[in-house]
């Protein structure tokens, strides 16, 4: 793997092959999908921007396993302190990631506020300055918030009457798919 040379964590420290190796080993030891990384025997780090994965057998799903949903690259300089990564204090305070948005505020049961990472390694991205994720537990309250324009998107279980009600709103575009969840955007 060849890493993007100007990619950094939110604290400004560079993302290195050591972080990749550490992240893979952490996932192999702790993640519910650790079997996705079972064929990875070792991760060599010949230089800061190169990680070489040595496999015990071919792994056709390696690219999927390396996706951000299964393998987020975490900073070794923070999580390499020997504490349990699942209970690490930096999971909830002074969170450091590497994505397009930085966590600014998390209020359990209320909201999550993310702000644009000005140092994101892809120029011109992200396109938004801020994302506010409101936690609205009640379906009716979610629908009312959509109708009033208080939220721009909602994902929830919606029955036919909810979908028909929202389709009547001039400010909403409703896209429903089969399955247990649907999302609405205004």
Task: Describe these PLM feature segments.
Residues 15, 38, 46-50, 96-98, ...:
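Extracytoplasmic
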Residues 1-33, 46, 52, 142-145:
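Aromatic- and charge-enriched surface segment that lines or borders ligand/interaction sites
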Residues 2, 8, 35-80:
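Surface-exposed binding/hinge segments that line
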Residues 69-126, 130:
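Gly/Pro-rich hinge or "lid" segments in bacterial periplasmic/extracellular proteins
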Residues 1-2, 20-23, 51-53, 99-102, ...:
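Short, well-ordered beta-strand elements
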Residues 56, 115-119, 182-186:
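A bilobed periplasmic-binding-protein/Venus flytrap-type ligand-binding module shared by bacterial periplasmic
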Residues 4, 118-164, 180:
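Ligand-site clamp/hinge motif
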Residues 37-39, 163-176:
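Ligand-binding "clamshell"
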């Amino acid at each position: 793997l060849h890493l993007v040379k100007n990619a950094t964590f939110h604290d400004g420290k560079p993302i290195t092959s050591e972080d990749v190796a550490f992240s893979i080993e952490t996932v192999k030891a702790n993640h519910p999908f650790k079997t996705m990384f079972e064929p990875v025997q070792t991760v060599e780090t010949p230089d800061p921007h190169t990680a070489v994965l040595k496999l015990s057998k071919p792994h056709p799903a390696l690219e999927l396993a390396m996706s951000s949903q299964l393998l987020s690259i975490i900073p070794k300089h923070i999580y390499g302190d020997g504490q349990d990564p699942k209970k690490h204090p930096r999971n909830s305070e002074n969170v450091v990631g590497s994505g397009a948005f930085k966590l600014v505020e998390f209020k359990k049961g209320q909201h999550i506020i993310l702000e644009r990472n000005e140092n994101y390694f892809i120029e011109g991205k992200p396109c938004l300055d801020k994302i506010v994720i409101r936690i609205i537990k009640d379906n009716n309250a979610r629908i009312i918030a959509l109708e009033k324009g208080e939220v721009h998107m909602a994902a929830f279980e919606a029955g036919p009457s909810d979908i028909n009600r929202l389709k009547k709103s001039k400010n909403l575009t409703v896209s429903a798919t089969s399955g247990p969840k649907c999302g609405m955007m205004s």
